[in-house]
Swiss-Prot record:
SMART domains: DALR_1. SUPFAM superfamilies: Anticodon-binding domain of a subclass of class I aminoacyl-tRNA synthetases, Nucleotidylyl transferase. Transmembrane segments: none annotated. It catalyses: tRNA(Arg) + L-arginine + ATP = L-arginyl-tRNA(Arg) + AMP + diphosphate. It comes from the Viruses. Gene3D superfamilies: HUPs, Isoleucyl-tRNA Synthetase, Domain 1. The keyword Nucleotide-binding applies. Pfam families: DALR_1, tRNA-synt_1d. The gene is RARS. This is Arginine--tRNA ligase. It comes from Acanthamoeba polyphaga mimivirus (APMV).
């Protein structure tokens, strides 16, 4: 926490409160001074609004406590420009049962972080960056963390619903790795169960030798119709499911082919999204262990049997956790609980995170309670990271005209097409000589960045509208605006004739440079906040505000001097600031999975 500015400011505030109370002979009046904290100031870095409450809690005159508190804060070199502001507020209060208006006076303490402290911290950070060290120094013990995300179903194309899990999950992994943790990305694909008996039966009956992922989708739809309408096909499907579970060579061969075609399709999308190191460990991996788990829980009398089903119940949830159906088949519940046990006892994870939509909250609550009930949890942490739906631009569920879920590949292709049209128009306006391959490459990068940022920029628990025109806009809080901000930094630095000018101290020369550098130092706060909440949108807020501060910096701080398009001079200090900001922007780009573009 040593680089987290708000944490440091509040620590110093708490120390000042303790000393103030000691000096006013009010020792131990307040057990938890940490309940008092700064908030963001309107025209200053921070303000303390609870001096009246503090005075009332201690039965002291508020002016006396404010004066003493200011004295203590002034003795700390972390702060400067400390002052008090008295505010009058009209408030309705009850006196003898009657409402009456009264004027309440509040005293607010405002202050800034000192220029000396900012200068020291900025230059320490800049030297760390130039030496190749990490911009973030972890303060936590390294943990083994498993993040379960994406998890599409085999034999089906990835759809728009998989987008959020994949993008949010990957960003969380990158942030946790930056914090020094050992992160294992797990893709818990749906690759087992009755649906594969249906597929295998249909493929055998129709002697289908080859198929694409789209054709597999159609095979699944047709087999589902037959399963629901034909008793004979339903029985055949169940027999094929048993045959698959028993390791029949022909059944396994067909299953492996379906699996391979599906995974190849998934990897094409993962490659576009920049998703690497995602280990596929689906339901089939735990198949043998499911039987062992259910038998063990049965013999230990941990299971309730109702209508030949094996169930478990937890407090507060009436819906049963189904471990075995009446026909002996296993369920989604069974595979998830088996996977959890494997991750705890075999893979020995310290922290397991499930990035799955919010509709599954009850399921994970049940499973976590069962794990505690079975005494599986010691010091490990289990966490469900839920998220809202992807909606159309009109606020309705994103569907095709026929009412089907939109394929993720179609979404990506559509955004790439729009980005390509915009890119071609800009190239035409600027008379640039780009070939079709260059246009497609840059358009793909823009499209993927826009898809990711449009998702991550929204609080994950909220539904968000998928609006192509809005996400590709070059103005406002969009990926295109951010990419332009980074490209401008790179363009300025490319024109510097001698990179050695980037070495040296950074000097805070004016208000815009101070505001920009203060924002740079808040990167620790935003990373800590992201880890604490598992909400990557805080990184997006920080990034947008940082580039906004950089834009203001340019208005009063010239970096390069030109005479008739000839470079005649430069400001080394301003170039160092731009270089530092560029590196911070690049790191945040990396954490949210955006790809950098040299020229935009």
């Amino acid at each position: 926490m040593q680089d987290n500015l708000i944490y440091l400011a509040n620590c110093f505030l708490n120390e000042a409160i303790k000393t103030t109370l000691q000096n006013l002979n009010k020792v131990n009046i307040i057990d938890t001074p940490e309940l008092y904290s700064f908030v963001k100031g309107i025209n200053t870095d921070y303000q303390f609004n609870k001096s009246t409450k503090l005075a009332n809690d201690c039965n002291l005159d508020k002016e006396k406590i404010v004066n003493e508190l200011i004295t203590q804060l002034k003795s700390n070199s972390f702060f400067e420009n400390i002052s008090s502001v008295e505010l009058e507020q009209n408030k309705s209060v009850k006196i003898n049962g009657k409402k009456t208006n009264t004027v309440i006076k509040q005293i607010m303490i405002t202050l800034n972080i000192s220029k000396l402290y900012l200068s020291n911290r900025i230059n320490l950070l800049y030297k760390r960056i130039l030496s190749g060290s990490s911009i973030y120094v972890p303060n936590t013990i390294t943990k083994k963390i498993i993040v379960d995300y994406s998890s599409p179903n085999i034999a089906k194309e990835m759809h728009i619903g998989h987008l959020r899990s994949t993008i949010i999950g990957e960003s969380i992994c990158r942030v946790l790795e930056m914090c020094g943790h050992d992160v294992y990305r797990i893709n818990h694909v749906g690759d087992w169960g009755t649906q594969f008996g249906m597929l295998i039966a249909y493929i055998k009956n129709n002697q289908i030798e080859s198929y694409t992922i789209s054709e597999l989708m159609n095979i699944y739809k047709e087999s589902r119709k037959l399963f629901e309408s034909s008793i004979d096909f339903k029985n055949q499907s169940r027999l094929e499911t048993v045959s698959l579970q028993n390791g029949n060579i022909e059944s396994i061969t067909i299953w492996q082919k379906i699996h391979k075609i599906s995974m190849n399709s998934f990897h094409e999308i993962y490659s576009l999204l920049g998703i690497n190191n995602l280990i596929t460990k689906g339901e089939s991996f735990y198949q043998d262990q499911m039987t062992e788990l259910v038998n063990s829980l049965t013999s230990d009398n941990k299971i309730t049997v109702e209508n030949d089903m094996k169930l478990m119940f937890v407090e507060g949830i009436s819906k049963p956790f189904i471990l075995q159906k009446s026909d002996g088949g296993f369920t989604y519940d069974t595979s998830d609980l088996t996977a959890l046990k494997y991750r705890l006892f075999i893979e020995k994870a310290d922290h397991i995170i499930y990035v799955v939509d919010s509709s599954q909250q009850e399921h994970f609550s049940q499973m976590f309670q069962i794990a505690e009930k079975l005494d599986w949890i010691k010091n490990q942490q289990l966490q469900h990271i839920g998220f809202g739906l992807v909606l159309g631009s009109d606020g309705s569920k994103l569907k095709t005209r026929s009412g089907e879920t939109i394929k993720l590949q179609d979404v990506i292709d559509n955004v790439v097409s729009h980005a390509s049209n915009i890119t071609r128009e800009l190239i035409k306006q600027k008379n640039l000589d780009w070939n079709d391959d260059d246009i497609l490459t840059i358009s793909k990068k823009i499209a993927i960045n826009c898809i990711k940022y449009s998702d991550l920029n929204n609080p994950r628990l909220n539904n968000y509208k998928f609006d192509i025109n809005k996400m590709l806009n070059s103005k406002g809080n969009t990926a295109v605006y951010l990419m332009y901000g980074l490209a401008r930094c790179k363009s300025i630095l490319r024109k510097v004739p001698n990179n050695t000018v980037l070495n040296g101290d950074i000097i805070i020369e004016n208000e815009n440079s101070r505001n920009l550098l203060l924002h740079v130092l808040k990167y620790v706060e935003v990373i800590d906040q992201t880890v604490e909440t598992m909400c990557p949108h805080y990184l997006c807020i920080y990034l947008y505000d940082l580039i906004g501060s950089l834009t203001k910096f340019y208005t009063t701080n010239r970096c390069l001097e030109y005479d008739n398009d000839n470079l005649i001079g430069y400001n080394a200090n301003n170039l160092r600031i731009v270089n530092m900001v560029k590196i911070i922007i690049s790191k945040i780009f990396e954490l949210i999975g955006l790809e950098e573009i040299e020229q935009l």
